Amino acid sequence: MPSVIVVGGQWGDEGKGSIIAYLALHDEPEIIARGGVGTNAGHSVVINGKKYAVRQLPTGFMQTKARLLVGAGVLVDPEVFFYELEHLKDFNVAERVGIDYRCAIIEPKHKEMDRKNDYLHGTIGTTGSGCGPANADRVMRVAKQAKDIKELEPYLTDVAAEVNDALDEGALVLVEGTQGFGLSLYYGTYPYVTSKDTTASAVASDVGIGPTRVDDVIVVFKSFPTRVGAGPFPTEMPMEEADRLGLIEYGTVTGRRRRVGWFDFEMARYAARINGATMLAVTMLDKYDKEAFGITDYDKLPRKAKEFIEEIEERVGVPVGLIKTGPELEHIIDLRENI
């Protein structure tokens, strides 16, 4: 069985959480591992009308048969970790989760630095979660690791070993990234970026998967890209236009209103190339065409929605395998058999 990596192709908030949740329930992976930066990105998913948001744990938590892992490349905030264990207790998460013992720790001092730094908080628009300062300490080799925190001892493991053992045994491993391509420290709109790379290559490294062991890379785009905080946004629309179209969203972590823009085909093509996308996922198609809401059969999509998907495939050069047509998990069109 393969390893599948899911990453964002825009500035985060693409709907990765809903795609990961669907894959977790539909494909039933044995392991769901989280890569990415840390608690500065929130993934949300709607289950039976109830919205769940996670910042530390894998978004595929609702697949109760899966082992949930947090890779060594991810920053861990113990306060957030234990809050989410309690928040998700109905899913028996505490019995299934493992944190790599090498994860660096976000301490209160890191969050304070993040929020009080005028440049980071005012100019860049950081989430204030402490990830930047914690990663800086990690680079300087002074950050604490998960193995140094006594409360985390019951959850410590070697994630890289677990993941590779699972792949050796033919298990399916689902790996989720955070944020999006436009926020990559290397390839994003620097300096208005996050504190590390966010591409599929980096996410694979975060959990200890070598390049030759990655089978599929799904890059997620939403019909109207959004951005929280400062930084270039070439296709941004006026807030009044977003209001008129009903495109009003708020960040999962910051609570700040998201800036909204038109779909950027050039950026999408570049993101797909750098991430090595084998397929694309398009979310919020119902925002682009309200008549597409809740449809689960591609042939039943209205013409406007179909033409948009076809244009994405043609201009980006990668097939669309998954399409979200609403907020619920079942609001999805799965075209992977056709790829």
UniProtKB/Swiss-Prot annotation:
Substrate binds at residues 252-258. Mg(2+) binds at residues 13, 42. GO terms for biological process: 'de novo' AMP biosynthetic process; IMP metabolic process. It catalyses: IMP + L-aspartate + GTP = N(6)-(1,2-dicarboxyethyl)-AMP + GDP + phosphate + 2 H(+). The active site is at 13 (proton acceptor), 43 (proton donor). Keywords: Cytoplasm, GTP-binding, Ligase, Magnesium, Metal-binding, Nucleotide-binding, Purine biosynthesis. Plays an important role in the de novo pathway of purine nucleotide biosynthesis. Catalyzes the first committed step in the biosynthesis of AMP from IMP. This is Adenylosuccinate synthetase. It comes from Pyrococcus furiosus (strain ATCC 43587 / DSM 3638 / JCM 8422 / Vc1). The gene is purA.
